[in-house]
């Protein structure tokens, strides 16, 4: 829009939002409306350059030619000034489209430790907190709200206005690869924490200082057949052998009550329920019948990424996740998603398909308008038309601010969960003990004791490990930790031998509920963590910080117990080694 063009009603901030929406909607072509319905990935960099590695067109093409205005920012951000300058460049390009509709930028979580292009980015310059499982281990809704408020400020500083989270799936199937992003197994705890999460990001109501939230994955991922993930065809079935479908809705009801602005359905298809056996975003009974009509959700529904177009991610061929409807062509997939009641297509850039559906009379323009209204309304409410740009020079003073970093580091320490502590091994009180370390940076450990190479000469061994998993092939698929939760037998033998030679503190990072039966009786202390630095771990070991964590899920005793459990039922493995809520503590200080 030319700066010399007379002011248009949709540009007038004094008018009611609904009036501005209707004015702008009435000026839009079908192609412009279609562009609104797509949100895909974009990576910081020159906006006129494509990203073939991720199969992405350039920002210039998507904004200028495809008329898109919603993008999911990929990757860790080491330089927040550069990130803010890049978001401003996108907004400047959007300002030169016919109607000057500003861009809405979104992100997966980027304030934790996980780095997976499909689910989260490592914190980088942002404050670093425990994973959401760690927040659940602490169990304080006030802390979760403070976390979300901190992240809100960091997002705003670089122009990110939509959080593709929280993830409130319930960890009732211990093998599932996405547990690390949840609040654990308990529906009531998840419901309590998600309310604080949404308050912290959005405030009492959505406005210019808010970051909108997209709660996922409706109606609750987690009960996956054999724990396999529906990003992939072999994991497409979502099962309810315990007839416990409604249990998984509890956190979503809480999110809606807290004002959740957006909702994302999961990839899976329900099997053996009253609902049609097609993926949730294609499922009219789930989106319109359950989410819209029964639960009363009036916000934006955006599909999970990649339901329409076959693509390649990180060199791995990825078929469209049109589970139960794989036989449909792309045009019919788009039609079914719109008929189901979704507003936006995640991970897709195919507005021409919507235009074709309207031209063929298969989808009415009124139906498109209903979704565009919701999407435009949020842009207006967030104040993007008044202030699309950020102060790039100020970004680095807000992102990673000292008090934000300190709060994240304190939460890391509090989230550590002590499972066993034989003869009060913890905290280690010996001055400058000899330390044998595995999985711990020796340079960091050297500040706490003398690091030695031979366990036999050590006073204590400190070992940090990841939850076991069965590696999968492929660039993208390999990033999802699935399969067995057992520590391999040879590793159990090695750890037991180490623990026999020297008192051993074993810290297991739990992105899934590991089976620790083979080592629990051998180590001097067993600790669970959910995203914590080596310094945080050592502070807990040496009593300089107080561990406050309680398990956010049961830890099963065996894989046989996992395999025999019902995927949709919490606390269902027989005779678990440790129960939900277990955690020991001890006084801090020297």
Give residue spans per PLM region.
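Short beta-alpha connecting loops at secondary-structure transitions
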Residues: 234-240, 272-277, 311-342, 352-365, ...
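C-terminal non-catalytic regions of proteins with extracellular/luminal or membrane-system context
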Residues: 1-13, 277, 305, 311, ...
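A general structural motif
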Residues: 51-52, 242-249, 326, 439, ...
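N-terminal beta-rich core of secreted/periplasmic extracellular enzymes
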Residues: 2-219, 249-266, 279-347, 359, ...
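A glycine-rich phosphate-binding loop feature that marks nucleotide/adenosyl-phosphate handling sites
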Residues: 40-41, 109-110, 169-170, 213-221, ...
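Short acidic, glycine/proline-rich loop/turn micro-motifs
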Residues: 175-179, 226-229, 274-275, 313-315, ...
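Binuclear metal-dependent hydrolase catalytic cores centered on His/Asp/Glu-rich metal-binding motifs
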Residues: 218, 225-245
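Long, compositionally biased
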Residues: 57-65, 395-405
